[in-house]
Amino acid sequence: MDFSIKPLDAKSTIGSIKTGCIAVAVFEDKKLSAGAQALDRKGEISAALKSGDISGKAGSTLLLRGVNGGTTERVLLVGLGKQDAVTEKDFNAAAQAVVRAFTTLGSSEAVIALPFDTVASRDSAWAIRCTILSAREAAYRFDSLKSKKEPTASGVKKIAFAVPAAAVNSAREAVTQAVAVANGIDLTKDLGNFPANVCTPTYLANTAKKMAKEFKLEVEVLDRKQLQALKMGSFLSVTNGSVEPPKFIVLKHNGGKAKDAPTVLVGKGITFDSGGISLKPGAAMDEMKYDMGGAASVLGTMRAIAELKLKLNVIVVIPTCENMPSGSATKPGDIVTSMSGQTIEVLNTDAEGRLVLCDALTYVERFKPAAVVDVATLTGACIVALGHHNSGLFTRNDDAHDALANELLTAGKVAGDTAWRMPIEESYQEQLKSNFADMANIGGPAAGSVTAACFLERYTKKYTWAHLDIAGTAWKSGAAKGSTGRPVPLLTTFLIARAQAAGK
């Protein structure tokens, strides 16, 4: 799908555009947008709104032909809600409705001439990004493993956004950013949707290598012997039951100044999680291929920022392996020594994500990072707490960590990929006490997402850190089963904002 900008000025107006379809907005209070007014020379649009053929409610649509004297073949009316109270939700509903209508349209090209600056506190660039991401979401298909591919949908393949000439530069930048983010989302979805016999730790490592070659990134992949030399006993304990070799991926984008400390993203990469000896129930176990959602999302984020040539130093670190039962697998009650030297009593082998992450969080100390954000499908408890709407955000409570949390929360709101801050307090650490080791890897059924974050927090004392639990947001179950691509929009928006702040 191709996206472009169509500048509007005194000579090039909405009324003079020749294309297969123009989408313009109408409002619930029976008012026309400026774009609709420009096409309503003979009153057809006003009549349709007045008669009730379209309500103007956000997301309502009506396709008309022969409007504006035929300079354009079709006019798609789309409702935006009440004119003076258009919300982000309203605009997104309208954008998604336009995209749905375009997929079945008998034209390959169209122009969107909505009032992109109609949402309070959001600019035209935000609206354009939302529309492009909606279009790419609708266009996404995962059929690479099917012997018979789904037929490619007809409809619009080229979309132009009609904007005033003064807004062209920011609009073009919005298109560039949105396409890069969409490419990152698609990569994340593909990696998540591949089965575990395809997307192995080696496959993830090869994906990182290909990305490094394409975008001139630095890459290093550590194997078992190197991990043993680093004394990553916690990470390696998870790998004991599988024949798949573990990998530890380090991918660097050196877009900032050499002296600038990097922002580090750590992604949990369990390519299949059976639970190990603490075996999961069989129902829906196939969905445990998504337990590498953190790894997939940080790779997708890296792809997006590399495509944008973001002026920021970013490092992605991925500890990746399978968690399988076998005669050599780690057993409940085993005690392992992490890279930090702290010992862990493994009371439940299905709480393995924190065991691989803690060694990665120790490893990244060497980069002297500006901030570290780990991303993981870590706990079912987070789904109980937050459902499938918000990712869980955890960090310490001080000025530096509050600032990092606010950066991530703001990025999530801007991107429509929201997170909710959860508590980390010393009182929860009591639940991780062990009679036989420095800590246990679980803290009982109460506040499971919090105690998991508290476990990770013990390995992050030397830098500013945040944890995103994406167990409820990384994929969908049921008829719409598949990877969502989250939290790539949040992470890319966060990094873009950091790059902009660094450039000031």
Swiss-Prot record:
Its cofactor is Mn(2+). It catalyses: Release of an N-terminal amino acid, Xaa-|-Yaa-, in which Xaa is preferably Leu, but may be other amino acids including Pro although not Arg or Lys, and Yaa may be Pro. Amino acid amides and methyl esters are also readily hydrolyzed, but rates on arylamides are exceedingly low; Release of an N-terminal amino acid, preferentially leucine, but not glutamic or aspartic acids. GO terms for biological process: proteolysis. Its main location: cytoplasm. Mn(2+) 1 binds at residues 273, 350, 352. It comes from the Bacteria. Keywords: Aminopeptidase, Cytoplasm, Hydrolase, Manganese, Metal-binding, Protease. PANTHER family: CYTOSOL AMINOPEPTIDASE, LEUCINE AMINOPEPTIDASE-RELATED. This is Probable cytosol aminopeptidase. It comes from Janthinobacterium sp. (strain Marseille).
